[in-house]
């Protein structure tokens, strides 16, 4: 279904880490998430989300151990307002890389670099 949406020119959003983390480090990207882009020959748009002026609020925004979405939302509503920077990075064309694994590695590298430059 994701590949068909991409072929139809529609957007699909995914978080390639495939789960929640403590916000201290970028986790590994699951290559299977990019399979639909390869199948549909659709470009991938990496996006980095940086919380805080120097990406220094990542751990505050991240899910606490065992925390579910509603708990995270309620906790964040009690936090001070935080700046978020949304960085749209260089799109990745599937034909220019070695399949889904190459896309995953390139996307992760771009996002990691963007967060380090904050």
Model-predicted regions and their roles:
Residues 1-10:
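Membrane-embedded segments
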Residues 23-98, 105-106:
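A cross-family acyltransferase "interaction/gating" segment
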Residues 110-117:
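C-terminal alpha-helix
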Residues 10-16:
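Generic beta-sheet signal
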């Amino acid at each position: 279904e994701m590949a068909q949406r991409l072929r139809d020119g529609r957007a699909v959003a995914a978080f390639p880490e495939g789960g929640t983390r403590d916000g201290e480090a970028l986790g590994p990207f699951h290559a299977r998430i990019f399979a639909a882009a390869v199948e549909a020959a659709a470009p991938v748009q990496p996006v980095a989300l940086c919380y805080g002026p120097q990406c220094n609020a990542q751990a505050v925004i991240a899910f606490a151990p065992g925390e579910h979405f509603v708990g995270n939302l309620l906790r964040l509503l009690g936090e001070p307002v935080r700046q978020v920077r949304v960085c749209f990075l260089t799109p990745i064309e599937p034909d220019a890389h070695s399949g889904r694994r190459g896309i995953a590695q390139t996307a992760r590298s771009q996002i990691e670099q963007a967060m380090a430059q904050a």
